[in-house]
């Protein structure tokens, strides 16, 4: 008697992930998310924010993005979605925006308190102090992550519920925290979207999928990725 045929494996869900498109390196994040099997969309309006399963806050200029969040009436709705458990990923300026406390910023700058952490803006110095290094990143296989730091922040305090994923391995900034996660929210000081290494984005897409599976409401578009 032949063995019963194996049940076909269900295709992974294709979540709709927004990229906050007010300022910064939006296009690179869109491409990385698409390559990881997500459906990336631009987010500039409240209605667009409400329709996504997760959100990327890209690198750019944190105080400019902070102002634009207020101009576009996105600040409070975004805080509310984060409180409700929406997954989010912030790189560089996005890390600053996700912090609960920001040092060396403008007194009128706003932040989202998505992660219980204190972040120092421009901690590594000016544009001329930008650099690259290899990082051991917790939860990622296949060797170190090549990290590009451009006027980057670092984390000076990580709260009790915050998982430290990566620190600077050497040099004058050795031991500084540059990647963290708290629940569904992920943040990096560096720009994974510019190196072609998709592992950090895959980690975030997996976070979004898992959150959607628990809630039973992942948006899976009918269109196929291009």
Swiss-Prot record:
Instruction: Look up keyword Hydrolase and say if it applies.
Output: yes
Q: Which residues form the active site?
A: 92, 191, 193
UniProt-annotated binding residues for L-glutamine: 60-62, 121, 150-151
| Name of the protein described by the UniProt record | Pyridoxal 5'-phosphate synthase subunit PdxT
EC identifiers of the protein = 4.3.3.6, 3.5.1.2
- Give the source's domain of life in one word: Bacteria
Per the record, the pathway is: Cofactor biosynthesis; pyridoxal 5'-phosphate biosynthesis
Q: Which InterPro entries match?
A: Class_I_gatase-like, PdxT/SNO, PdxT/SNO_CS
Organism per entry: Nocardia farcinica (strain IFM 10152)
Annotated catalysed reactions: aldehydo-D-ribose 5-phosphate + D-glyceraldehyde 3-phosphate + L-glutamine = pyridoxal 5'-phosphate + L-glutamate + phosphate + 3 H2O + H(+); L-glutamine + H2O = L-glutamate + NH4(+)
Q: Recorded GO terms, molecular function?
A: glutaminase activity; pyridoxal 5'-phosphate synthase (glutamine hydrolysing) activity
Q: How does it assemble?
A: In the presence of PdxS, forms a dodecamer of heterodimers. Only shows activity in the heterodimer.
The Gene Ontology biological process terms listed for this entry are: glutamine catabolic process; pyridoxal phosphate biosynthetic process; pyridoxine metabolic process
**Which PROSITE patterns does its entry note?**
PDXT_SNO_1, PDXT_SNO_2
Q: What does this protein do?
A: Catalyzes the hydrolysis of glutamine to glutamate and ammonia as part of the biosynthesis of pyridoxal 5'-phosphate. The resulting ammonia molecule is channeled to the active site of PdxS.
Gene3D superfamilies for this protein: 3.40.50.880
| Pfam families hit by this protein | SNO
Q: Which UniProt keywords apply?
A: Glutamine amidotransferase, Hydrolase, Lyase, Pyridoxal phosphate
The record's section on HAMAP family has: PdxT (MF_01615)
Question: Where are the disulfide bridges?
Answer: none
Describe the family membership recorded for this protein in Swiss-Prot or TrEMBL. Belongs to the glutaminase PdxT/SNO family.
């Amino acid at each position: 008697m032949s063995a019963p045929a194996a049940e076909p494996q269900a295709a992974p869900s294709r979540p709709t992930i927004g990229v906050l498109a007010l300022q910064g390196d939006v296009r690179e994040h869109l491409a990385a998310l698409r390559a990881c099997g997500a459906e990336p969309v631009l987010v500039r309006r409240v209605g667009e924010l409400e329709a996504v399963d997760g959100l990327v806050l890209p690198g750019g200029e944190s105080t400019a993005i902070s102002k634009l969040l207020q101009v576009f009436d996105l600040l409070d709705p975004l805080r509310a979605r984060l409180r409700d458990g929406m997954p989010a990923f912030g790189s560089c300026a996005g890390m600053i925006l996700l912090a609960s406390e920001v040092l060396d910023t403008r007194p009128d700058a706003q932040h989202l308190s998505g992660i219980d952490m204190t972040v120092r803006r421009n901690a590594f110095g000016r544009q001329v102090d930008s650099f690259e290094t290899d990082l051991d990143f917790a939860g990622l296989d296949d060797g170190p992550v090549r990290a590009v730091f451009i006027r980057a922040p670092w984390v000076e305090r990580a709260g009790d519920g915050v998982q430290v994923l990566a620190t600077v391995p050497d040099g004058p900034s050795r031991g500084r925290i540059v990647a963290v996660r708290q629940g569904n929210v992920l943040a990096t000081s560096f720009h994974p979207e510019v190196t072609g290494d998709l592992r950090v984005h895959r980690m975030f897409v997996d976070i979004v999928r898992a959150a959607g599976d628990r809630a039973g409401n992942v948006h899976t578009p009918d269109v196929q990725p291009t």
